[in-house]
Amino acid sequence: MKTFFLLVCLPAIALSQRPSDIAELVDSWAVTYGFEPELIQAIIEVESSGNVKAVSGAGAAGLMQLMPATAAAFGVRNRFDPAENIRGGVAYLAWLRDLFAGDRRLMLAAYNAGHGWVLQHGLALPSAPVVAYVDRVAFVFRRLRWERVLREGGSAL
């Protein structure tokens, strides 16, 4: 009876924000743009902790914390819509990957600090917050990869 009550009373938007729905969106867009789903999941975890309604002090919003100009450039009209946000965020990440010739550290630094900053400074001018961001995403990415290996019956040793 409780399940029926929850399904009837929850707004439709809440059903579209289930973790399994978000994981499906991540998997789909990651594959479309040639990324490992765990990388996109790691960015989401670091950027918003999976909160579809997250807003930063700088004005970034949604799961992948898109700034208004970035969202507009990649066709995202509603930054709080998980499907649009993930699609736009992954498309932006692919653009950054191409801009920085596949260098993941520069790609992630640019996702965090902006591509203009990285084009000007690269990682030669260490910015503690930017380096910490890149390291945090890399750490979460590795953790998620190991979790997948274990879930699929592999061994961590």
Report residues per predicted region.
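Catalytic glycan-binding domains that act on GlcNAc-containing polysaccharides
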Residues: 15-157
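N-terminal signal peptide c-region/cleavage motif recognized by signal peptidases
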Residues: 9-11
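Positively charged n-region of N-terminal signal peptides that target proteins for export
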Residues: 1-4
